[in-house]
């Protein structure tokens, strides 16, 4: 595992897989010891970007990564497929329970995902899932899904209490865990980090989000 600088942005149009593209404008306070997280099943070359929402239980303890996933294309209540674009280098796994978080922090219509099918060509980086009709109700293109606490539950598995300070690159097939320092107070470029629902941002009031566009 390697730590790189305060970097990384990935979107449909731009990728800087090992860049020095800055995301942090100012870091006032961080848990420098950070926490560790499991790399079980994580492929070599995976990048966990700076600015990823995380939850740290204690200094030097365990950090929970809170990846988000963007819906690609509108999804009707009768749809039986769902296409997602991972926002943080974390591919949604089979059985992962996700749902859309409302502005009130409610995760409506959470359900488990099936086996991901990687798309190719112009759709590379996106994954298609088979779903049961009305699993997620209706979703709009660009909606952000978060990990939910349980199928049918009305809340997220966890809320962030900070953002990752630097990007982490998995550079070995034998790595068992990674570590991340967590920023709790600072200023960050919100359009260079993984998209997240507004309720996530409200959960970390020490972070000020600035936008370029």
Label every model-predicted segment.
Residues 1-213:
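Surface-exposed, low-hydrophobicity beta-strand/loop segments enriched in small/polar/acidic residues
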């Amino acid at each position: 595992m390697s730590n790189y600088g305060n970097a990384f942005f990935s979107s449909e149009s731009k990728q800087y897989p090992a860049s020095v593209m800055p995301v942090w404008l100012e870091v006032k306070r961080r848990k420098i010891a950070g926490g560790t997280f499991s790399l079980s099943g994580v492929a070599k070359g995976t990048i966990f970007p700076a600015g990823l929402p995380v939850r740290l239980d204690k200094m030097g303890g365990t950090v929970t990564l809170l990846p988000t996933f963007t819906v690609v294309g509108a999804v009707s209540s009768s749809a039986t497929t769902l296409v997602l674009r991972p926002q943080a280098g974390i591919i949604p796994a089979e059985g992962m329970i996700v749902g859309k978080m409302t502005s009130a922090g409610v995760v409506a219509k959470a359900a488990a995902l099936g086996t991901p099918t990687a798309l190719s060509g112009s759709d590379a980086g996106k994954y298609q899932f088979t779903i049961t009709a009305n699993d997620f109700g209706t979703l709009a293109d660009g909606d952000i899904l978060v990990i939910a606490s349980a199928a049918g539950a009305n809340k997220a598995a966890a809320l962030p209490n900070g953002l990752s300070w630097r990007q982490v690159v998995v550079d070995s097939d034998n790595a068992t865990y990674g570590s991340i320092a967590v920023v709790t107070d600072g200023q960050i470029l919100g359009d260079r980090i993984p998209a997240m629902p507004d309720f996530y941002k409200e959960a970390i009031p020490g972070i000020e989000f600035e936008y370029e566009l």
